[in-house]
């Protein structure tokens, strides 16, 4: 049975009829059937895989791992996220139906870990890409800590009002080597800036106005010449 308390759901009449609200009923059904999408890239994922065994038995929480983001409402990121993998992670998150949740598992996912000290290709925190609901520190976290994070997420869902959830702004993201992310307008317009065909010696010399400035379309013949 679910041990999470609902203020309205606990009131019953003499005939054992439960009086509740649609919002509490929706929260109860969602927290009892979380379907996670496992996004594991490092050793933290091995710790999460041990939860599937009989020792921890995470099926008692209603967790059913899914391989498709369209069938999942929880994504669990475990391991290092590189700049090259960032667009794929954002695409998976945007394909998940609302409401959706994120658990960041491990130091590499939360802050970049030891790989972020001298690596230009490591994302220093997955929350720069997608909104995170629960942070789970550790290197790697134990399976008991993962269960505790899932319990905290279930408590958060129990107190949730769906209309108050802040839906993240959808748009194309631009990120640079200094790990600054920006929402920009669509770049898939077929228009290209000729000034970017011959980049300077340092990418830091390109201003933001120049990078997102659009001119008339350039034909393939002009590009060759």
UniProtKB/Swiss-Prot annotation:
InterPro entries for this protein: NADH_UbQ_OxRdtase-like_20kDa, NADH_UQ_OxRdtase_20Kd_su
The entry's free-text remark on the cofactor is: Binds 1 [4Fe-4S] cluster.
Under catalytic activity, the entry for this protein gives: a plastoquinone + NADH + (n+1) H(+)(in) = a plastoquinol + NAD(+) + n H(+)(out); a plastoquinone + NADPH + (n+1) H(+)(in) = a plastoquinol + NADP(+) + n H(+)(out)
User: PROSITE patterns from the entry?
Assistant: COMPLEX1_20K
Query: What Pfam families does the annotation carry?
Result: Oxidored_q6
Protein keywords: 4Fe-4S, Chloroplast, Iron, Iron-sulfur, Membrane, Metal-binding, NAD, NADP, Plastid, Plastoquinone, Quinone, Thylakoid, Translocase, Transport
List the Gene3D superfamilies hit by this protein, alphabetically: 3.40.50.12280
Listed binding positions for [4Fe-4S] cluster are 43-44, 108, 139
Q: What is its EC number?
A: 7.1.1.-
Where, by residue number, does the polypeptide cross the bilayer?
A: none
Q: Where in the cell is it found?
A: Plastid, Chloroplast thylakoid membrane
Query: What would be an example GO MF term here?
Result: quinone binding
Q: How does it sit in the membrane?
A: Peripheral membrane protein
Q: Which PANTHER family match?
A: NADH DEHYDROGENASE (PTHR11995), NADH DEHYDROGENASE [UBIQUINONE] IRON-SULFUR PROTEIN 7, MITOCHONDRIAL (PTHR11995:SF14)
According to its UniProt entry, the function of this protein is described as: NDH shuttles electrons from NAD(P)H:plastoquinone, via FMN and iron-sulfur (Fe-S) centers, to quinones in the photosynthetic chain and possibly in a chloroplast respiratory chain. The immediate electron acceptor for the enzyme in this species is believed to be plastoquinone. Couples the redox reaction to proton translocation, and thus conserves the redox energy in a proton gradient.
What the entry lists under NCBIfam families is as follows: nuoB_fam (TIGR01957), PRK06411.1 (NF005012)
By sequence similarity, the record places it as follows: Belongs to the complex I 20 kDa subunit family.
Q: What name does this protein carry?
A: NAD(P)H-quinone oxidoreductase subunit K, chloroplastic
Name the species this protein comes from: Lobularia maritima (Sweet alyssum)
The root-end lineage is: Eukaryota, Viridiplantae, Streptophyta, Embryophyta, Tracheophyta
Q: Which gene encodes it?
A: ndhK
């Amino acid at each position: 049975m679910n041990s999470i308390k609902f203020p309205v759901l606990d009131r019953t009449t003499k005939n054992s009829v439960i009086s509740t609200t649609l919002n509490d009923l929706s929260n109860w059904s969602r927290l009892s059937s979380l379907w996670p999408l496992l996004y594991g890239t490092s050793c933290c994922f091995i710790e999460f895989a041990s939860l599937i065994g009989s020792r921890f038995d995470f099926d008692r929480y209603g967790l059913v791992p899914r391989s498709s983001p369209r069938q999942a409402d929880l994504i669990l990121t475990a391991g290092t996220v590189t700049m090259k993998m960032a667009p794929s992670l954002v695409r998976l998150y945007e394909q998940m139906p609302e409401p959706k949740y994120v658990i960041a598992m491990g130091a590499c996912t939360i802050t970049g870990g030891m790989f972020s000290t001298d690596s230009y290709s490591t994302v220093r925190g997955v929350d720069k890409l997608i909104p995170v609901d629960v942070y789970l520190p550790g290197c790697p976290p134990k399976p008991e800590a993962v269960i505790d994070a899932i319990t905290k997420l279930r408590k958060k869902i129990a107190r949730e009002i769906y209309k108050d959830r802040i839906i993240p702004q959808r748009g194309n993201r631009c990120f640079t080597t200094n790990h600054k992310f920006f929402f920009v307008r669509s770049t898939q317009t077929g228009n290209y800036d000729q000034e970017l065909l011959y980049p300077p010696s340092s990418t830091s010399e390109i201003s933001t106005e120049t990078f997102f400035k659009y001119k008339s379309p350039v034909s393939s013949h002009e590009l060759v010449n």
